[in-house]
């Protein structure tokens, strides 16, 4: 029988529910259980694919091409699993499916209501996420906070699950903020009490509290919360602020969180062996070197827009025994006059993805600087496309060369729209999304990074591609197409073999990086940056 764990939040949002859920998932996986995890987002968008990065942060793409919440990146990195389209559910997605069924007459004339039709659809998504992955345990995080009007159907569905599958198969975990008032010199439990009262008013009695605190709460506070919120004192778990996120599973294990969960769900499984994880955390906290990486982006005011990129850089730093000193460079500020001042001390330069014209000329200037000064450079998605544009302009002397996305009237569209995208009008969910194979060129730096594999599978999110009408001209000038689709139609990776490391990929390698298994192209980039640093 599948076990269901539901994680809700109270008092404030952005309290770390996703990290708690992911950490618990890691602990349960290390007990030998097959775990999957999903996120419920109460907003009305179908998915975050068309949302501004300033609103939502990065869009995380799964193997099967779902555009999802960035929390799924945390889930995959912590638990080291590959999620699917059932792992992110929004209000918009549920309502659109229910309304489509209503239009097709599938409800046989019934009045379509929140209960039971919306709640049934939500419960179906929970069960599908478990059955499609054949999981022993599914953890479902509900976005937002208890009390939000948007969350009510989701919480009602969670309440009903207890009756549907039995109390021994369901556990409710509520995460809240435990604020410390410096002037009073004490922690305040009242916000948590009111949050739990609100949750209980909706028919859900939490079995565990996870309290987010800046400093240890003490047993007295835990006992008080246990008494007022009707949970066992040992089931009041602290989630303290830490230096590194990957410490959190160890901190939760030290408080027996996973054992309490297993006892409640009647799971008789071995204790989690976290030896390897602990060794990784110890290494992360004692890195011997520091490497300066310049990230040239257009959304740098909100680092969450590049969350997976940053994590992938860190992961590759771990295996190189180096901390990543990240310098956020606003692409709009990069000009021929400022580029040396902005990038002159960088050991490596990364140019990540994005959409739209703003900042692209600055990115092109950064790529030119990396090429001309032989600074290790990694381009991702739009960064790959602009690498081709830069080379066309400044090496092939194709004046005004550009992407057709950025300049539809360019004389030299070295980047053009994909053929199967030409007649598509909708923006949402219509990109080339998900896992696709990439055939590597033997002897290239890219193939070397991937241990000379012939084919790798990586996740994509794009609508434009390299224009093959220019391929011969590029190749004759020494530009290497080191990764292509198996049918040789789509350019996936480009590089300059005479540079320390000058590689750009159409796909998003960061989406498959893990702290204990860094992505190979990122690792090759950081290795080159470390060597460049030592050569200074």
From Swiss-Prot:
- Residues recorded as binding ATP, renumbered to this chain, are 14-19, 71
What does the record give as its pathway?
A: Pyrimidine metabolism; CTP biosynthesis via de novo pathway; CTP from UDP: step 2/2
Q: Where Mg(2+) is bound, by residue?
A: 71, 141
Q: Which Pfam families match?
A: CTP_synth_N, GATase
The regulatory note on its activity is: Allosterically activated by GTP, when glutamine is the substrate; GTP has no effect on the reaction when ammonia is the substrate. The allosteric effector GTP functions by stabilizing the protein conformation that binds the tetrahedral intermediate(s) formed during glutamine hydrolysis. Inhibited by the product CTP, via allosteric rather than competitive inhibition.
**Gene Ontology terms, MF aspect:** ATP binding; CTP synthase activity; glutaminase activity; identical protein binding; metal ion binding
As recorded in UniProt, its EC number(s) are 6.3.4.2
Q: List, for all copies, the residue spans of the domain called Glutamine amidotransferase type-1.
A: 292-535
The annotated region (Amidoligase domain) lies at 1-267
Instruction: Give a GO biological-process term.
Output: pyrimidine nucleobase biosynthetic process
| InterPro entries (alphabetical) | Class_I_gatase-like (IPR029062), CTP_synthase (IPR004468), CTP_synthase_N (IPR017456), GATASE (IPR017926), GATase1_CTP_Synthase (IPR033828), P-loop_NTPase (IPR027417)
Q: Which UniProt keywords apply?
A: ATP-binding, Glutamine amidotransferase, Ligase, Magnesium, Metal-binding, Nucleotide-binding, Pyrimidine biosynthesis
GO CC, alphabetical? cytosol
- Additional facts recorded: CTPSs have evolved a hybrid strategy for distinguishing between UTP and CTP. The overlapping regions of the product feedback inhibitory and substrate sites recognize a common feature in both compounds, the triphosphate moiety. To differentiate isosteric substrate and product pyrimidine rings, an additional pocket far from the expected kinase/ligase catalytic site, specifically recognizes the cytosine and ribose portions of the product inhibitor.
Q: Which PANTHER family match?
A: CTP SYNTHASE, CTP SYNTHASE-RELATED
The protein's assembly and partners: Homotetramer.
From the Swiss-Prot or TrEMBL record, give the protein name.
Answer: CTP synthase
